[in-house]
Amino acid sequence: MMTTLTARPEAITFDPQQSALIVVDMQNAYATPGGYLDLAGFDVSTTRPVIANIQTAVTAARAAGMLIIWFQNGWDEQYVEAGGPGSPNFHKSNALKTMRKQPQLQGKLLAKGSWDYQLVDELVPQPGDIVLPKPRYSGFFNTPLDSILRSRGIRHLVFTGIATNVCVESTLRDGFFLEYFGVVLEDATHQAGPEFVQKAALFNIETFFGWVSDVETFCDALSPTSFARIA
């Protein structure tokens, strides 16, 4: 059953049961003091409201029959998946650079199985959800995401998570190139960097690549009364 979500730059209509809510990298690394972003010098002090908003969005999406996909960014314990000096990721990943500057952190940042890699305690995938590891910023790179979505007839993706200007935007952009409709819930995302970075990422998304809404509006669009209005 179709519903319409109020968004910028215009409303967008979608079928929740042919849509997915994507939770990007809500790991200790990105959202918890003592995690990678914090150790690399980024401010994570305002991530708690984002976690609560994601909980709300996930609950509403699951009740409406949306597929929930959780991403975890990181690599194997030996960092083979991160790429060596021949990979730009080796030179640009702030996690890898932080470990090179602080050797005592080697093996602790974004390594599979580590505390840093784990999802935050408040966000727990449920049976029927899909959890995918990803080795780069985009959730489409070297993952089965595209195949999972296409096999289910899913064309609309609603994004939450961290960081708005890095992995969220990268995944939404790649989805745009693959003909997916991408929506970001702005109060369920958080940037890596100053506040203007969040605004710039959202401007890019709503102007060139997708749509921007918020959690309260999203939940309202999934309420039974909204479906009744469309019907």
Swiss-Prot record:
The keyword Signal does not apply. GO terms for molecular function: hydrolase activity, acting on carbon-nitrogen (but not peptide) bonds, in linear amides. Induction: Up-regulated by the nitrogen regulatory protein C (NtrC also called GlnG) and repressed by RutR. GO terms for biological process: nitrogen utilization; uracil catabolic process. Keywords: Hydrolase. Pfam families: Isochorismatase (PF00857). It comes from the Bacteria. Its EC number is 3.5.1.110. The active site is at 25 (proton acceptor), 134, 167 (nucleophile). It catalyses: (Z)-3-ureidoacrylate + H2O + H(+) = (Z)-3-aminoacrylate + NH4(+) + CO2; (Z)-3-ureidoacrylate + H2O = (Z)-3-aminoacrylate + carbamate + H(+); (Z)-2-methylureidoacrylate + H2O + H(+) = (Z)-2-methylaminoacrylate + NH4(+) + CO2. The keyword Chloroplast does not apply. HAMAP family: RutB. NCBIfam families: RutB. Belongs to the isochorismatase family. RutB subfamily. Hydrolyzes ureidoacrylate to form aminoacrylate and carbamate. The carbamate hydrolyzes spontaneously, thereby releasing one of the nitrogen atoms of the pyrimidine ring as ammonia and one of its carbon atoms as CO2. This is Ureidoacrylate amidohydrolase RutB. It comes from Escherichia coli O139:H28 (strain E24377A / ETEC).
